[in-house]
Amino acid sequence: MSRRMTEHPLITLTALTALVSCTFCYTSSLEARTPKKAKPKLQVCTSGVLDKLEKHRDWEHRRSALVASGKADHSAQDILTTTRHGVTLTGKFAYGRSSKDLEDEFVEILIDACDGSYKSLGTAKTDDDGRISFALDMARLPKPGVYNLALRVQGDGTVARATLRVFPPKTKLVVFDIDGTLTTKDAEIFQDAIADFFEPIYSGDVVPESREGAVEITALRAQQNYPLVYLTGRPYALTRITREWLNTQGFAPGNLHVTDESEQVLPTEKGVGVFKRDYLKSLIARGFILEAAYGNAETDIFAYSAAKVSPRRTFIAGPHGGKEKTQPLGEGYDTHLPEAKKEAAPKQPFRR
């Protein structure tokens, strides 16, 4: 040790303390002057007008013209993702009452451009089941927001519509089942009754009745700044009808996800239970947080539990409410609504 440090230890210690204190003050001052990164504002691009297809592309196959002579019965899944996770857009293209598949034909994928028009993302070709898949990687995702999609058959200009929703990671969601949860009847109760249940809905002969307070609870959750997910065991053929029903009944807008395969409709854990579980887990993998979930069936309880939704935030209507420590709703939402209104709005990583 040097003579100076030996002779003046107090002075040296005092100087060192002052230096550290000064450095801390400078760092704190710098942090105070550095603005926090602003939360992104959600864009809502849902008012664009899709121009009429002026020139149809020639059909790849002569048989396609015959198939397309029936009424278009196309469908497409809504897409929900975060800014850090690419997605695959999917659609199913068929015609007529027998739902004849459109095979090996081109479909153009368009997105609302936020300026009153649509822009093309590219094209895809249907497979032998009438389906298309179109990958949209993370770099091509639009800014956080809600965007209308149009999947247009190039041969005749018919369209399947869907919505793309993009949020920052750690966005908190609320999930709703539909049949038996928002409606008074459940298609999942008896496997043998599935066809009988869905056929009147498909034909338009029956309009499902909503549970008392169901519209209000979705409106409340939306007002609390939760994006909503409508997760149902309904088959893809009911996509358009289900969207229309949610809209005309006054339910808050949300992401609709239906089954893609007949096995997923089955009212068992291995059927609709696994379908819902896997979809919810895919949302978690994309960076979402499942804040609460509403259902009515044991398959809902299974799926929500498997996706790690807390039983205290799992609300079950009907006779299964309370099972597995879930929260019973009874036959309506009148008791639940006042309690839900007391909840503070969540901290979300976006602003509207």
Regions found by a protein language model. Give the residues of each.
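Bacterial N-terminal signal peptides that target proteins for export
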Residues: 2-15
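Bacterial N-terminal signal peptides
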Residues: 14-24
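Intrinsically disordered, serine/threonine/proline
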Residues: 24-163
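C-terminal cap/substrate-recognition subdomain and adjoining C-terminal extension
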Residues: 33-64, 113-119, 187, 193, ...
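Short beta-strand edge segments in extracellular beta-sheet folds
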Residues: 163-169
